[in-house]
């Protein structure tokens, strides 16, 4: 069994562990560093599933904006919701707390449109809730794309290729 995880065995069979791979020629490197002295732009690119934990970030923005003003944090969600569950976890929060200005739903984007969104971004949002699916160790493609674009990023799972690197932040693998 070949896996992107660190599991030695799966279903009783020994594994061959590899890292997920990307084609660097297909991924555009971010060209400049944005001025973050007045605002911060986060980007999450995915077919949005519950394990991405984007609802955790939106709840964090609710708490942030209830306690702070003056420094704006924007969350650009790029991709479609996989199911109603994900929509129902995120969209009502945005509406209830008037976050439409700060949580921007772009839908699916590719090519130059996606590259332009990455140019605006200051940090990538990886999976923030892999614990919901029982996965603790995984080497996701999205983390590799953020790194290839030269974008710092945050995630909650264990990814042995990136642990301890200066350009990543780790979120707790829980519901905080």
Question: Language-model segments: what does each one mean?
Answer:
Residues 45-50, 81-82, 109:
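Short donor-sugar binding/catalytic loops of nucleotide-sugar-dependent glycosyltransferases
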Residues 34-61, 75-76:
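Conserved donor-binding/catalytic core segment of Leloir-type glycosyltransferases
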Residues 4, 18, 42-46, 78, ...:
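Short hydrophobic "strand-cap" motifs at the C-terminus of beta-strands
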Residues 6-7, 21:
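Carbohydrate-associated surface elements
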Residues 52, 112-114, 124-147, 154-165:
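Nucleotide-sugar-dependent
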Residues 13-17, 21-39, 50-53:
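Acidic anion/phosphate-binding donor-loop and adjacent secondary structure
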């Amino acid at each position: 069994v070949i896996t992107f995880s660190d599991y030695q065995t799966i279903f009783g069979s020994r594994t061959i562990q590899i890292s997920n791979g990307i084609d660097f020629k297909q991924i555009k490197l971010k060209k400049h560093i944005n001025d973050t002295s007045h605002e911060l732009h986060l980007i999450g690119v995915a077919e949005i599933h519950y394990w991405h934990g984007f609802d955790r970030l939106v709840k964090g923005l609710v708490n942030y904006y209830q306690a702070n003003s003056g420094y704006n944090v924007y969350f650009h969600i790029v991709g479609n919701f996989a199911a109603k569950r994900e929509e129902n976890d995120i969209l009502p929060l945005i509406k209830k707390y008037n976050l439409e200005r700060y949580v921007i739903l772009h839908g699916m984007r590719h090519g130059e449109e996606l590259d332009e969104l990455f140019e605006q971004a200051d940090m990538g949002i990886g999976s923030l809730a892999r614990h919901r699916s029982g996965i603790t160790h995984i080497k996701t493609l999205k983390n590799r794309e953020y790194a290839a674009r030269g974008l710092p990023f945050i995630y909650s799972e264990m990814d042995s290729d990136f642990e301890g690197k200066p350009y990543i932040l780790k979120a707790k693998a829980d519901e905080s």
